[in-house]
């Protein structure tokens, strides 16, 4: 499989994930502003998840700018990431319909941490396949953002059982960290 085909497949899966999430939003029953109130938790959950999917799509794009060719290991690592991201519509709907209850917020966090781990695995597989001359290895020599994200996810999951809104705050902090695209890869590609 070519790199372009893998990227197109991934883009398609991510687009479907967003489509599924937006289709879960229901039209309000009334015509007043007050009729929006019942769907507000689901809408907020959708916005949050949309941002996360967008972050992964953006970083996936940057990640594959460094890749020259793909092999079976990269394909499977990429599918592993897409698997965890594909569960996001379920978790999104659950936290929205439960109004951010404890177990749904914990489950959402587990999905986020598993997606982060899968993304890190994908990075490592690409580096291993590219060898010592890996542009990705050169670009991401520091993994501070990755490590702090995992710590915040763990804190969020642990906190979710007592204070689910604080847990959402931890997940929100991770999104803020990654909202600005990681410039390490672009910088490394320009230097080479």
Curated annotation (Swiss-Prot):
The chain crosses the membrane at residues 1-24, 40-65, 72-93, 102-126, 134-162, 165-180. A motif (RxxxFSD motif) lies at residues 5-11. Residues 26-39, 94-101, 163-164 are extracellular. Residues 31-37 are annotated as: Short helix H2. The record marks 16 as: Hydrophobic filter residue 1. Potassium channel. This is Potassium channel HX13_20290. The lineage of its organism: Bacteria, Pseudomonadati, Bacteroidota, Flavobacteriia, Flavobacteriales.
